[in-house]
């Protein structure tokens, strides 16, 4: 490097001297000439590169800002997956990504709400009194706050279908056999209960300690039900059947409070109107009616599943009631 600097300086000095000899009027100022060294050239190159990089970053950031609304499109197009453009029957845009129009339905409100399975065997009685024992602390904690009560109920009611569907799914894989449609039926139940929760979240805004209670209850109930289903599926399904009977009772009390004016009959959330295909002017009472009907259908499905096991058969031997609403 030192040789390069000296050689460059020597060339500059020789060039200036020759120009002075050819044209004497050109002043000889070799003593004031500063020769650019290699280090200076490097610094200049680095500054140029950084300036170019900064310019490119500004351009790219501007492009990102301009494409803020196209971020999702860029992501999905990168993977080759394009979102479907879905519209309602009237041509308006479908705004829900958590469910699609073909997953919506009109609930059957004519279902018998008073059906009850009388416990006769020891597992049935154990399941029945387990559910009854859980009702007492719930009544004590929520009392007549039925919106929050419904929210807590749905966080628990959405667990059995997922656990049962998961275990039946694993059994189907393990034994290389079909499930008779029960995987889908149980997962449908779990998804339906979750939609109940999403609906009541719009009605009852839970505070911090209710959210903490949900975390604790869900953690305990999930593991307890998982073990219970592994030990005795007929007991697990029977318990859910009784749990749904309690849910019917709870929503019936909810309706009484609405009819008596103790709870304001507010307009139905938009998500409920689209999910259950309710009228545009539907109210909270209409929502509670369809949710109660859903719980009655879940009651029937789980008591039916328990009866299959009581008869010494497996779920795959009886076609699952898929789409039973």
UniProtKB/Swiss-Prot annotation:
It comes from the Eukaryota. Residues 1-44 form a transit peptide. Induction: No effect of antimycin A, ethylene or cold treatments. Keywords: Disulfide bond, Electron transport, Iron, Membrane, Metal-binding, Mitochondrion, Mitochondrion inner membrane, Oxidoreductase, Respiratory chain, Transit peptide, Transmembrane, Transmembrane helix, Transport. GO terms for molecular function: alternative oxidase activity; metal ion binding; superoxide-generating NADPH oxidase activity; ubiquinol:oxygen oxidoreductase activity. CDD domains: AOX. Its EC number is 1.10.3.11. The chain crosses the membrane at residues 150-170, 212-232. Its cofactor is Fe cation. GO terms for cellular component: chloroplast; mitochondrial inner membrane; mitochondrion. Fe cation 1 binds at residues 154, 193, 196, 295. It holds the Pfam family AOX. It is a multi-pass membrane protein. Belongs to the alternative oxidase family. Homodimer; disulfide-linked. This is Ubiquinol oxidase 1b, mitochondrial. It comes from Arabidopsis thaliana.
């Amino acid at each position: 490097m030192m040789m390069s600097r000296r050689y460059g300086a020597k060339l500059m000095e020789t060039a200036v001297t020759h120009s002075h000899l050819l044209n004497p009027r050109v002043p000889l100022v070799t003593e004031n000439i500063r020769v650019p060294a290699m280090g200076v050239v490097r610094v200049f190159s680095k500054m140029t590169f950084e300036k170019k990089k900064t310019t490119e970053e500004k351009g790219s950031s501007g492009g990102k800002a301009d494409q803020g609304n196209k971020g999702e499109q860029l992501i999905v197009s990168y993977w080759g997956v394009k979102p479907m453009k879905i519209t309602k029957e009237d041509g308006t845009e479908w705004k829900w990504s958590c469910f699609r129009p073909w997953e919506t339905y009109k609930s059957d409100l004519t279902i018998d709400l008073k059906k009850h399975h009388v416990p006769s065997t020891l597992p049935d009685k154990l399941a029945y009194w387990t559910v009854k024992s859980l009702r007492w602390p719930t009544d004590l904690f929520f009392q007549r706050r039925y919106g929050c009560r419904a929210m807590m109920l749905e966080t628990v009611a959405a667990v059995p279908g997922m656990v049962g569907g998961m275990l039946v799914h694993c059994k189907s894989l393990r034994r290389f056999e079909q499930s008779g449609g029960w995987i889908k039926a149980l997962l449908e139940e779990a998804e339906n209960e979750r939609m109940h929760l999403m609906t009541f979240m719009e009605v009852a805004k839970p505070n911090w300690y209710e959210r903490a209670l949900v975390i604790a209850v869900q953690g305990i109930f999930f593991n307890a039900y998982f073990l219970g289903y592994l030990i005795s599926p007929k007991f697990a399904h029977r318990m859910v059947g009784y749990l749904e009977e309690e849910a019917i009772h709870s929503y019936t009390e909810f309706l009484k409070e609405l009819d008596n004016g103790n709870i304001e009959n507010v307009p139905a959330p938009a998500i409920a109107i689209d999910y259950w295909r309710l009228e545009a002017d539907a109210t909270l009472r209409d929502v509670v009616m369809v949710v109660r009907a859903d719980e009655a259908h879940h009651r029937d499905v789980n008591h039916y599943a328990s009866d299959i096991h009581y008869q010494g058969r497996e779920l795959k031997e009886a076609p699952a009631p898929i789409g039973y609403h």
